[in-house]
């Protein structure tokens, strides 16, 4: 056990990139990452998915008893329990949640994409409509902490997108004899107006959303839960594996790994604040990644000293120490700001803080990050709770090609092709030529049939095209 006092040894390892002209592949390989084996998780999760698919609510109750050590009487939380949770919510916590919701809704309202159209010629238009996904399942994890903030981050953009049907699954609280979820989570659902909530966690919750679940007891009804079109929300490796396994036939936001922070800092940064920010992320999980990129050995040394003082004094000291001393965390020493930026882009952090003299200039050069936190007064916990931004972000380097959760996550763009007779007529001969070149003549014949008498008479086709005004 870690106790009050000052630690003697440095906590974080050093990765020294100075004096090295690394290729892109070498830079990617040098970044600190935890080894994430998924084969064992897959072997454990697949039978859970199959059992829920087959037995529905009966399997869900069995798995809740096995994994969460409680057998919920009502897998679907009664609406009265959701309302009651709000009446007993601490007023200060309620005010914080409501402010978070207000800010998240303001940002989400501006994220709603607009339909548009392009006129290419007379009678030739292509439009794009953004259509909300009809039914979405939102997963809110339990485990080491309670996450009402995850309810907000998932539900608010879905509501802004216009999703018709929202369902939330979250594990039952182990200290609740009835098997109800945490009351703060239920109260947050009440504030957001979400009343379809299930006391189901883990891989079994993902299975319920993906396949739906038939009832097994009278209170369940014939159908406990209808299948959804998309599943969003963070979770542990078993939740992530389950999402991956069902993603062939139901949409998912991402396969999320452990949370992570990257910080670019120069000699102007405050080392005590840097240490506090690294600790704040490490608090999430023993596998959480915390990485500092700096060209200042003085800053690196002072951060190590601050960590020695701070880590033993934080409540979850053992968890934090395990995370910061793990292979997924490091202080990366660079030759200068340019190399720090290159390394940060290679790392592609879920959260990237910029604590440098000219933060705006650095922000403009960031290509890969789930979210960017500019300056010392924009720490990651601000984004976790209250900034208005979304905290469901790509992890494990996937910010190189993926984005965080937003209104767009819950919508799909659909193109509408609107050509009239003259618009198609102007292209008919060219479409036919294109189709023939790909050995798909029926494609061309389909178009020509609208203008010529016999598109199959190749001997007279060119003449027919001329008579029809296609040439």
From Swiss-Prot:
Chain residues that bind NAD(+): 139, 204, 236
Keywords of this entry: Amino-acid biosynthesis, Histidine biosynthesis, Metal-binding, NAD, Oxidoreductase, Zinc
Cofactor requirement: Zn(2+)
Pathway(s) annotated for this protein in UniProt: Amino-acid biosynthesis; L-histidine biosynthesis; L-histidine from 5-phospho-alpha-D-ribose 1-diphosphate: step 9/9
Gene Ontology cellular-component terms listed: cytosol
Reaction catalyzed: L-histidinol + 2 NAD(+) + H2O = L-histidine + 2 NADH + 3 H(+)
Keyword Amino-acid biosynthesis part of the UniProt annotation: yes
A single BP term in Gene Ontology: L-histidine biosynthetic process
Function: Catalyzes the sequential NAD-dependent oxidations of L-histidinol to L-histidinaldehyde and then to L-histidine.
Family statement: Belongs to the histidinol dehydrogenase family.
Name of the featured protein: Histidinol dehydrogenase
Organism the protein comes from: Bifidobacterium longum (strain NCC 2705)
């Amino acid at each position: 056990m870690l106790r009050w006092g000052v630690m003697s040894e440095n906590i974080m390892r050093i990765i020294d990139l100075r004096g090295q002209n690394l290729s892109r592949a070498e830079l990617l390989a040098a970044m600190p990452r935890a080894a994430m084996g998924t084969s064992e998780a897959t072997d454990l999760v697949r039978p859970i998915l199959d059992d829920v698919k087959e037995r529905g609510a009966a399997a869900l109750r069995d798995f809740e008893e096995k994994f969460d050590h409680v057998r919920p009487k009502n897998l679907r939380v009664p609406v009265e329990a959701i309302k009651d949770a709000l009446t007993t919510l601490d007023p200060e916590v309620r005010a914080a949640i409501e402010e978070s919701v207000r800010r998240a809704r303001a940002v989400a309202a501006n994220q709603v994409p607009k339909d548009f159209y392009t006129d290419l010629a007379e009678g030739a238009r292509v439009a794009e409509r953004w259509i909300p996904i009809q039914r979405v399942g939102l997963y809110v994890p339990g485990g080491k902490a309670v996450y009402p903030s995850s309810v907000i981050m998932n539900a608010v953009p879905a509501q802004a997108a216009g999703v018709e049907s929202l369902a939330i699954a979250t594990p039952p609280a182990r200290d609740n004899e009835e098997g109800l979820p945490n009351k703060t989570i239920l109260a947050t659902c009440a504030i957001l107006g979400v009343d379809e909530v299930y006391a189901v966690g883990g891989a079994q919750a993902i299975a319920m959303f993906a396949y739906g679940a038939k009832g097994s007891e009278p209170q369940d009804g014939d159908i406990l839960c209808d299948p959804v079109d998309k599943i969003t929300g963070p979770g542990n490796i078993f939740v992530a594996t389950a999402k991956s396994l069902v993603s062939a036939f139901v949409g998912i936001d991402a396969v999320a790994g452990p949370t992570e922070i990257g910080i670019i800092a120069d000699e102007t940064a405050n080392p005590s604040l840097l240490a506090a920010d690294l600790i704040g992320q490490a608090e999430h999980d023993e596998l959480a990644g915390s990485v500092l990129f700096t060209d200042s050995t003085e800053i690196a040394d002072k951060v190590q000293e601050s960590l020695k003082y701070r880590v033993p004094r934080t409540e979850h000291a053992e968890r934090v120490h395990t995370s910061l001393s793990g292979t997924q965390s490091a202080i990366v020493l660079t030759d200068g700001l340019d190399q720090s930026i290159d390394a940060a882009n290679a790392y592609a952090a879920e959260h990237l803080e910029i604590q440098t003299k000219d933060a705006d200039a650095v922000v403009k050069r960031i290509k890969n990050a789930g979210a960017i936190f500019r300056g010392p007064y924009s720490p990651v916990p601000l984004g976790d709770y209250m900034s208005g931004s979304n905290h469901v972000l790509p992890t494990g380097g996937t910010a190189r090609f993926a984005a965080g959760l937003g209104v767009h996550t819950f919508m799909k763009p659909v193109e509408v092709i609107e050509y009239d007779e003259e618009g198609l007529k102007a292209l008919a001969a060219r479409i036919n030529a294109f189709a023939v070149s790909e050995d798909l003549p029926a494609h061309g014949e389909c178009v020509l049939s609208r203008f010529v008498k016999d598109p199959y008479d190749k001997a007279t086709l060119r003449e027919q095209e001329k008579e029809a005004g296609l040439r």
